[in-house]
Amino acid sequence: MARIGDGGDLLKCSFCGKSQKQVKKLIAGPGVYICDECIDLCNEIIEEELAESGEVKWEELPKPMEICQFLDNYVVGQAQAKKALAVAVYNHYKRIQAEAVGAPGTDSVELAKSNILLLGPTGCGKTHLAQTLARMLNVPFAIADATALTEAGYVGEDVENILLKLIQAADYDIKRAETGIIYIDEVDKIARKSENPSITRDVSGEGVQQALLKMLEGTVANVPPQGGRKHPHQEFIQIDTTNVLFICGGAFAGLDQIIEARTGHGGTGFGARLRAVSERSTDDTFSQVMPEDMLKFGLIPEFIGRLPVITNVRSLDRSALVRILTEPRNALVRQYQRLFELDGVELEFEQPALEAVADQAMLRGTGARGLRAIMEEVLLSVMYEVPSNPDAARVLITREVVLENVNPTIVPREFTGRRARREREEKSA
């Protein structure tokens, strides 16, 4: 860089042209100089670009129909629940993006978030729906078990530990965590014992509901980075839950009876109409749930008010379970076929065998969650034998294998080779 005059005190910044006397600091490089003001400006530009790249663009937010189509690739059935979730999630992140970009009208109308309550029996896809949504939107996702939570000051997990799981899922990026999704499972287990307020302390029921209120609504929470109360001198992490979407799920066993008592289906006395058990399913009953039913079940009014979107997932029948085995992109049958492919073996299921697996899952009452356990039992012996059998080319699973514990048929390579040659000869003829 050229000097001004003979003195060495008038060096110029190569970017802004200011002299050494006009700035606080001038840093020299090989033939160039940069001042402290230009360094600060460069840092501001870099921070702005990084912040913009980390945000979801307004035009990139998927529409509700696109969200439903994505869910269809991974979750079988549950059309009503998918529609409700898609609309709620779209409105939630649309609100966040509108506030981020300063969309017209946001100054006059403040948009509140709508948390979601999912009702339905175990193994019907509540957790899977929430996980798939988070994966599609590329936002941090955390699952919490409500049964482990207790009121502050008692043995158990604090509600702030839920937020710690979300922060960990975001790799401690607080800004990302503040737009994440938290799924609180088994939320029906924190219902109080009766609909009337109790004079005794309910530390794992109503006390947990009270502790969750501010978090669901939106507050700046202090989260212990090491969890729990074992490290009293640790510095807390602050996270704003205003834009965190909470999805609460539970089986709510017994809620159907409360709804039926309100709607008048069934009844008692000499003039009451006797109703067959199969006439009205739990799924149909859950679709008519009202806030007053949740209150009678044991949720406090403040907690119900912070979960405005209530939807239910339906029980899975035999055909739905068979579809779950084969249709989704990560279907169980495809997963096991891939495992056998790694050993150079083809795995084939007959349709009656898949139906038998679905029947077993329905008998156990475990829903889709029990399918993997049944598949492991069915394939255990063949998964033990095949890796040590170099002649194995194909494994056939029949209905008898599932129901009668018969060993699967292992077809040798020589037989499959002869069959392939025969098929080629028949085609050429």
UniProtKB/Swiss-Prot annotation:
Gene3D superfamilies reported in the protein's UniProt record: 1.10.8.60, ClpX chaperone, C4-type zinc finger domain, P-loop containing nucleotide triphosphate hydrolases
* ClpX-type ZB domain sequence ranges: 1-54
Per the record's keyword annotation, is rRNA-binding included, yes or no? no
> Gene Ontology cellular component?
HslUV protease complex
Q: Report if keyword Nucleotide-binding is assigned.
A: yes
Specify which residues bind Zn(2+) according to the UniProt entry for this protein.
Answer: 13, 16, 35, 38
Q: Which PROSITE patterns match?
A: CLPX_ZB (PS51902)
NCBIfam families registered for this protein in UniProt: clpX, PRK05342.1
| Quaternary structure annotation from Swiss-Prot or TrEMBL | Component of the ClpX-ClpP complex. Forms a hexameric ring that, in the presence of ATP, binds to fourteen ClpP subunits assembled into a disk-like structure with a central cavity, resembling the structure of eukaryotic proteasomes.
What's this protein's family per the entry? Answer: Belongs to the ClpX chaperone family.
Q: What is this protein called?
A: ATP-dependent Clp protease ATP-binding subunit ClpX
Give me the gene this protein comes from. clpX
